[in-house]
């Protein structure tokens, strides 16, 4: 049964590739997540050779920036006012992306290091809360379940990817065990705190710019 679920996951990673003409490129980050899962044993060996927060942050920010670049590609053919980005100008958007994504990558990294979160749990919690945050709540208010699923997959993938890369090392650490409800509550706190921090950093980055 576990093998069948794993095969299903790996095959599902092909879906974003096959739907690019209709759904765009942004959710290709899910394909990257699935590919990482497929070769996770090798990735864990490389990661554990020199683990640390700096390496985790590097992987997390590469994941986040890859997602943002894909989002820019999907929005280039739209008028600037209609682009679902941090800023309609691609270069400015990439500048602001550092402020937005860093708190989510950092806080989830600290939470996963201390508590027994799996990449799947980060995927679900981070993806579900992303539905509320995307476009300042406009996606959630659209009441479109397909849009919800799309956002869940995109947000969940970029947040879970560094956790999956580090999971081989994390499992060897003495992390505090939490039950499902406590994990959910703490995960929501991580998301809320990261969202507030991202908002503050975005304001600061815009002032500096």
Predicted regions and their residues:
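Aromatic-rich, lipid-facing transmembrane alpha helices and their immediate juxtamembrane interface loops
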Residues: 1-209
